[in-house]
Amino acid sequence: REALDILRVHHYGYMEDEALRERIAELKEAGKVRSLCLIRHFEKDQQIYADRGPEPEADADLVIYNYVCRGQEPGIATAAKAGKGVLIMKALGGQYLSWQHKNSTDWSQATEETLIELSPLGESMRHELDLVYSFSAGPWRDLAQAGEEVAPTGSAVAWVIKNKNVSSALVAVASVEELQAALACL
């Protein structure tokens, strides 16, 4: 292979480093990089995306979007109008809490401290608690059907991919059972 299909770069790094932007432009021009995807992981980068949409030079953005974290919808719509790709991360709310905890916790009563108590990462995640809480905590159980104690993960994936402006949802699994549950929406 003579080219990278997708080069993922953190938005803040891309915007703050002119030499990086120039080098990526050169590599794209030379055919060494086919597509640039800006990662919108941090809150400031997410807000810029929600407010303005994609950067003109980017071919796609990787953004946080799920059933309980919908703040990216304006940016996603703007990206679609501009013909840009939209890749979704954290479709299942990230790895900070188990799916069981996401479904069984009463998030109307819970606080950020509840998230720290439930997460196996505990205090080590305090520095990014605002961000993690925004995409982990919320009414996941609303995705359950009558008689289900826990919403199937496929329901969360289905909710994300039903947005016609979403190009792709990145979903992580660790077992055949998790894979089958996530794919149940197809």
Predicted regions span which residues?
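Beta/alpha (TIM)-barrel catalytic core signal, keyed to glycine-rich beta->alpha loops juxtaposed to Asp/Glu
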Residues: 9-186
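Phosphate/pyrophosphate-binding loops at sites that engage ATP/ADP/AMP, CoA/4′-phosphopantetheine
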Residues: 1-2
